[in-house]
Amino acid sequence: SDTLQYIKFFFREGTAENGGFQNFSLIFETNIRNAILNECSAEFSNMYLMLLDYLADYMYFDLKTERISNENFSRTVEKFNQTRRTAIKPKSFLISCVNANILTEATDDFAVEFHDKNTYAYFVAKALNRQFEKDPTELAKLKFVMQHICFGINDTIILFLSFIRSNTRIITAIQVAAQDLLQEFQEWDFKERNIPFLQYAQKTSAGVPSKKDRKETKLHTERVEEERHNTIKFRGIFDYDEGDVQKEKYVILRALKYTQLIGRGLVDQYGNLDANEVDSLVSSLYSLPQKIVYAILKPQQEHVDDIVQSLLQFAKESMPEEHITEEKIRHLLADAGTALALNILNDIAFNATNKSTIHALESYSPHNNNAKILRLMMQENTGDTA
């Protein structure tokens, strides 16, 4: 339909320009409400939406499942009826939600599930929001989502939650969490050479990216993000080992996820944030990525000689005709480390920058050369490198 085409266009163009999540969230929420209204009367629609929150909360936090049996589904509806003094019929509720493409019946095992993982994440976020409104001090479920942000749909839940509440406290809480995770790490600073093996990187000359280059880079980023979501579609959102949560690599990845969310939050909440909050977030966006780079590369630095010798031995045994030298391997390691570092910086620049936020981002006084590079990346993401 024309409406669907418009929504697709608005999502594609709006998010590319905005750099955040707000446009998608607004359309998503509107579509959910309209879909329910098309299937039942207005008096039932609000009850159905609250029951969907209740169902998502129970499935996600209590059952930790993507599917709920038909029997358990009916019991959950009846429990909602008892606690809320409502009289919703499980079958009527299910039919309406299936027709609205919110729930799906899995006929192969007589179960019910949310239509897709974004819909599931949205209603979990709505349930969390409702809990905050009742008791702002009850944070156990939010802490679970934050701690598991590297896994499943938890990052999407946080994004929806920050939009639903339009509350800057969520973004500032994420900022504090990121700072706590990275407090023991210093910032990567190539002038100070605190990751010495990167000094072997081979120098290359490159010009300022053209408009075509920036467009191709943006399209590539969108394709990567789409592939990531498609991968999640076919992988269970609870398919992870709880023991992995506190492993150092996931702690650093969690800090990276938090920093990405700070950038998106700056974009989505810009205008709602006080000046001192903006300044604090901007300062973190310049500092935290450098700490993440340091945290990732420091273990490699500590064992770089062993890594070089191991690779050198491998090269001699596997490809003696190439005559690969130790110097060549050090160059390759440095090039790879530098590329990783710059990709992390550019990822944060991409998430934090649009035509509104660039004013605050440019106003920050860079405290080292790394920060100057990050600022250039932010300018490039708005097409302003003049």
Which residue ranges define each predicted feature?
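Generic helix N-cap/helix-start motif at coil->alpha-helix transitions
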Residues: 118, 138, 149-156, 185-186, ...
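Extended hydrophobic
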Residues: 1-131, 144-152
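Charge-dense, extended regions
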Residues: 276-386
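Surface-exposed polar/charged interaction patches
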Residues: 13, 34, 38, 58, ...
